[in-house]
Amino acid sequence: MSQVEFEMACASLKQLKGPLSDQEKLLVYSFYKQATQGDCNIPVPPATDVKAKAKWEAWMVNKGMSKMDAMRIYIAKVEELKKNETC
């Protein structure tokens, strides 16, 4: 697993034709943020900002996960989404 593979997965995600569910978007987002920035380092958004709060909560779930593990999971999830798209 390398940075190049991670970047290729990021590019592949943008090429998916079908829409992702909100849950899939949050999951991919959370692993991307953990892989690129590490643990969530922003304050909790206000409850009135539902989208930002959901993204924050998704990222917080990965607290303590290494960037490398997050990259691996991100790549695997993108591969799964690509595979499901061809079915």
Swiss-Prot record:
Subcellular location: Cytoplasm
Positions of disulphide bridges: none
Chief location bin: cytoplasm
GO molecular function, one term: fatty-acyl-CoA binding
One GO term of the biological process aspect: fatty acid metabolic process
Function: May be involved in the energy metabolism of the mature sperm.
Keywords per UniProt: Cytoplasm, Lipid-binding, Transport
Gene that this polypeptide is encoded by: Dbil5
Protein family according to the UniProt entry: Belongs to the ACBP family.
Domain ACB intervals: 2-87
Alphabetical list of PROSITE patterns matching this protein: ACB_1 (PS00880), ACB_2 (PS51228)
Residues that bind an acyl-CoA: 29-33, 55, 74
Protein name: Diazepam-binding inhibitor-like 5
GO cellular component terms attached to this protein's record: cytoplasm
